[in-house]
Structure formats: C-alpha cells, structure tokens
Amino acid sequence: MKVGIIGAMEQEVTLLRDRIENRQTFQRAGCEIYTGQINGVDVALLKSGIGKVSAALGTTLLLEHSKPDVVINTGSAGGLAPSLNVGDIVVSDEVRYHDADVTAFGYEPGQMAGCPAAFAADEKLIALAQEAIADLQLNAVRGLVVSGDAFINGAEPLARIRTTFPKAIAVEMEATAIAHVCHQFAVPFVVVRAISDVADKASHLSFDEFLSVAAQQSTRMVEAILAKLAAR
C-alpha cells in the first residue's frame, strides 16, 4: 500500500519529510511531492500550498504522479467544538465547503453544484485514526470539518459558520478540496489535523504561536497510523 499525505504549509510537512527514508523529490506547478518510506510504508508526501485551488491542484498531481491507495490530510485547523484545545486532534467523518452557496438552485449550504452535499471520509481510515488516538492518549473529536478560502478570525464569520454548520468541529482551508479530488478519483481519504487555534477574534495570534504544536501533534498521529498499516 502507498499512502498519500497532504499538508499545505512547510511547517505542516517538515517533520514528516525528515522521517522519509530513500527520499526523492518531485516538483511541479508550485507543489512538492516527497516519496520514500516511513515505518516501512511507501508514502508520497505533498506540500500543496494554502487554499482550495492549491490543494486541488496538488492533490491531482499527487494522485496522477504517485498513485497512492489512500490519502491522509494532515496539518492544523481552527477548533469549533467546545471541548477542543490547542494540540487536540480532529478526525473527519465528512467535510464540506463553508463558502460555497448555490442554494438558489436547490442545493444545500456548502454543496457544490453536481457534487454530494458532503464528502465522506473512509471508515477504515477513521478507525485507524481512532486506534492511534487511543494509543497516544490524545483528546480528539470526530465529526464535520468545513473548508473555505478564508482564515476565520472574528465574530461575524465564526457566527455564520456556526449557524450554517452547527455540527462542524473544525475549520480550515484545504480539506474539502482535497476530498473533492479524492472523490473524483475514487481514492479513500481522511482528515487528521491538530488544533492550532480556537476560531475567534484572536485566532491569528494563537495560530502563529501554536502552529508548531499542531504540527508536532498531527505528525505523531500520521506516524502512528502508518505504524499500524505496517503491522497489518
């Protein structure tokens, strides 16, 4: 099995990249893909860049170039669930766009025309993530992750998301675009991210301070999932 791993930013991929054995690098269109092995598992690690377009472009390149069997989206997220604190883990059961609106034509909020209302994560990958959470004894929440081309920093956008998507546990900028591409290619995916900030008016300050914590925690999770895959 080959596992595709996607992070948007340098800080979100650097720890995993350093753990890749027999590493080779592929660069195209502003994206970087690092291939090799972690814990004996073949991996292809993508640094996509920030936002939905960069994520979709990079994911397409990853799937075409490296042909992974599954995809894990890692990195940081803003917490929406009240039980989440910096460093805690979120695992997607589904993802939606929070900034797509074609409701005038009968679609649900966040649903893109011609697409499912939500993109469902793979149950087997979710189960592996939950096993890793138990092993590492981390606080985690499973649920809806929402994505859009905005860093949520303020009461008004936060209130809009909470009102429109009351079940959302976290918000970030790439996961749904990644899931959208995986859906088109019929490749199973899961989002496993760590909380860098609680989405509020000071979230930009928290993000700058705690991104490294989120990167460390999400890396621990990905490594634990890979170790479980290697043992099977």
Swiss-Prot record:
Q: Where, in this chain's numbering, is substrate bound? A: G78, I152, M173, E174
Tell me its EC number(s), please: 3.2.2.9
> Family, per the entry?
Belongs to the PNP/UDP phosphorylase family. MtnN subfamily.
HAMAP family, sorted: Salvage_MtnN
User: What is the recorded name of this protein?
Assistant: 5'-methylthioadenosine/S-adenosylhomocysteine nucleosidase
Gene that encodes the chain: mtnN
Q: Which residues form the active site?
A: E12 (proton acceptor), D197 (proton donor)
> What InterPro entries does the entry give?
MTA_SAH_Nsdase, Nucleoside_phosphorylase_d, Nucleoside_phosphorylase_sf
- Catalytic activity from the UniProt record: S-adenosyl-L-homocysteine + H2O = S-(5-deoxy-D-ribos-5-yl)-L-homocysteine + adenine; S-methyl-5'-thioadenosine + H2O = 5-(methylsulfanyl)-D-ribose + adenine; 5'-deoxyadenosine + H2O = 5-deoxy-D-ribose + adenine
The record ties this protein, via Gene3D superfamilies, to: Nucleoside phosphorylase domain
Under CDD domains, the record lists:
MTAN
A cellular component term from Gene Ontology for this protein is: cytosol
Give the organism, scientific name. Pectobacterium carotovorum subsp. carotovorum (strain PC1)
Q: What is the lineage of its organism?
A: Bacteria, Pseudomonadati, Pseudomonadota, Gammaproteobacteria, Enterobacterales
Q: Name one GO molecular function term.
A: methylthioadenosine nucleosidase activity
Its annotated function is as follows: Catalyzes the irreversible cleavage of the glycosidic bond in both 5'-methylthioadenosine (MTA) and S-adenosylhomocysteine (SAH/AdoHcy) to adenine and the corresponding thioribose, 5'-methylthioribose and S-ribosylhomocysteine, respectively. Also cleaves 5'-deoxyadenosine, a toxic by-product of radical S-adenosylmethionine (SAM) enzymes, into 5-deoxyribose and adenine. Thus, is required for in vivo function of the radical SAM enzymes biotin synthase and lipoic acid synthase, that are inhibited by 5'-deoxyadenosine accumulation.
Disulphide linkage map: none
Swiss-Prot/TrEMBL GO biological process terms? L-methionine salvage from methylthioadenosine; L-methionine salvage from S-adenosylmethionine; purine deoxyribonucleoside catabolic process
Question: By its UniProt entry, which Pfam families does this protein fall under?
Answer: PNP_UDP_1
